[in-house]
Amino acid sequence: MSYEFFDISSPKEMLEKAKREYARMKSDLNTDNIFNFFVTAYHVMDHIKTVSGVDPKAIQGMYDDDFRMCQFACNKGKHAILKTITPYSSFADSVGGGETIYEVVDGSKRVRVEYLADKLINKWEKFFRENGI
């Protein structure tokens, strides 16, 4: 057993953390859990770049619209003001006083965070399989 505080040392461990954050987000959809998921899901890439030896072209292939939305949500939560111009925005609305809907918006395209999170987890799992991680 390790007694280090931050002991995530591999891409697999970071993906497993993202899955735990995803489960928390699905069971209790709120800004804290949304923030934690997107920060973790985005930073899976850091571990891939530093320790996995995956071909840079495969890594570059992950940078699609979904991953850029993830990057936006991660950075939007971490920084008071984004220094990079982005086409994305975030939106939350309580429908009829009921549940709050959280979305990432790209122009006229609105993506619920739960849907985006599900797509990201599936893409990461596929990426890991295809690259032997």
Stretches with model-predicted labels:
Residues M1-F35, G53-I133:
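Acidic, Ser/Thr/Gly/Pro-rich intrinsically disordered interaction regions
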Residues F38, H43-S52, A80:
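Extended, well-ordered alpha-helical segments in internal regulatory regions
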